[in-house]
C-alpha cells in the first residue's frame, strides 16, 4: 500500500472567494473605499464570512474521500489584522467541520512546507518556491490573470 500524497490548499482565492468578499465590503462601506483600497486584508472581520469558491466544498470532499491524499490548509494571515487567523480557522470549521482539525498552517513561508502539491492562486509567500508541485489555481484576485487550473473541476481532473 502506498503512502498518501500531501496536498496543501490555500484559502484566499482558492477555498474562499476573497474577491467577492472585498467587493461586498466596499459596497456596504463605500465611504471607506479610498482609505482601504490598497490594503483590504487589514479590514477586521473580512475573513470571517466570505463565500466559498464555486464547487470547492464538493471538490475537497472528493479529494478526501478518494483516500489518495492527506489534505492540509496552508494560508497566510495579514500581520496587521490580528483577528484574521481566528476568522480563517472558524471559516474552515463552518464549511468543512473537522476535516481540517489540526491540519492548518498559517505561514508567510509556504516554501518551508514539505508535500506533494500546493493549490494556490499566487506565487507569493513562498508558494512559487514550494518543494512539490504548485497547482496555480483560478483567476488571481489581484491581477485578474487566469491560471492553468481555472476552477475546481480542473483540479479534480489533475488529481483524481
Regions found by a protein language model. Give the residues of each.
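Acidic, Mg2+-coordinating phosphoryl-transfer loop and its flanking beta/alpha structural elements
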Residues: 119-153
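Active-site neighborhood of HAD-like aspartate-dependent phosphohydrolases
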Residues: 1-47
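Conserved Lys-Pro-Asp/Glu-containing loop-to-beta segment of HAD-superfamily phosphomonoesterases
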Residues: 103-129
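Generic beta-sheet signal
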Residues: 11, 74, 137-139
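Charged phosphate-binding loop/patch that engages nucleotide di/tri-phosphates or the phosphate backbone
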Residues: 2-6, 50-51, 58, 62-66, ...
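Substrate-recognition element of Asp-dependent hydrolases with the DxDx(T/V) motif
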Residues: 51, 56-86, 92
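A short, structured active-site edge motif that brings together acidic residues
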Residues: 72-79, 89, 93-112
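Short catalytic/ligand-binding loop motif for oxyanion handling, primarily in non-cytosolic enzymes
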Residues: 16-18, 24, 71-73, 80-84, ...
Amino acid at each position: 500500500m502506498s503512502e498518501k500524497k500531501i496536498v496543501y490548499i490555500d484559502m484566499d482565492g482558492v477555498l474562499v472567494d476573497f474577491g467577492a468578499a472585498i467587493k461586498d465590503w466596499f459596497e456596504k462601506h463605500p465611504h471607506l473605499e479610498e482609505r482601504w483600497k490598497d490594503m483590504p486584508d487589514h479590514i477586521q472581520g473580512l475573513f470571517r464570512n466570505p463565500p466559498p469558491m464555486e464547487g470547492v466544498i464538493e471538490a475537497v470532499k472528493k479529494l478526501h474521500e478518494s483516500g489518495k491524499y492527506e489534505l492540509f490548509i496552508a494560508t497566510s494571515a495579514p500581520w496587521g489584522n490580528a483577528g484574521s487567523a481566528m476568522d480563517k480557522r472558524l471559516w474552515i470549521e463552518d464549511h468543512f467541520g473537522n476535516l481540517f482539525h489540526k491540519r492548518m498552517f498559517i505561514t508567510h513561508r509556504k516554501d518551508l512546507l514539505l508535500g506533494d502539491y500546493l493549490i494556490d492562486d499566487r506565487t507569493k509567500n513562498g508558494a512559487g518556491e514550494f518543494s512539490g508541485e504548485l497547482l496555480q489555481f483560478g483567476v488571481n484576485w489581484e491581477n485578474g490573470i487566469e491560471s492553468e487550473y481555472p476552477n475546481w473541476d480542473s483540479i479534480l481532473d489533475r488529481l483524481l
